[in-house]
Amino acid sequence: MKRTYQPSNLVRKRRHGFRARMATKAGRKILNARRARGRKELSA
């Protein structure tokens, strides 16, 4: 059986990266929430 998680750095960056977050209103909201919490890393 094939596992569900097949790691790929390219797909990871495209889906969860900083620029992907900045591209949508909801994504920017996520970044602001993570900044407010004081997260060291904001995105993948």
Swiss-Prot record:
Gene of this entry: rpmH
Keyword set, alphabetical order: Ribonucleoprotein, Ribosomal protein
Entry protein name: Large ribosomal subunit protein bL34
Sequence ranges of Basic residues compositional bias: 26-38
Cited InterPro entries: Ribosomal_bL34 (IPR000271), Ribosomal_bL34_CS (IPR020939)
Glycoprotein recorded as keyword: no
Gene Ontology process terms (BP): translation
GO molecular function: structural constituent of ribosome
PROSITE patterns assigned to the protein according to its UniProt record, in alphabetical order: RIBOSOMAL_L34 (PS00784)
Keyword tRNA-binding among record annotations: no
Higher taxonomy: Bacteria, Pseudomonadati, Pseudomonadota, Alphaproteobacteria, Rhodobacterales
PANTHER family according to UniProt: LARGE RIBOSOMAL SUBUNIT PROTEIN BL34M, MITOCHONDRIAL RIBOSOMAL PROTEIN 34 FAMILY MEMBER
Superkingdom field: Bacteria
Family membership noted in the UniProt record: Belongs to the bacterial ribosomal protein bL34 family.
GO cellular component: ribonucleoprotein complex; ribosome
Region (Disordered): 25-44
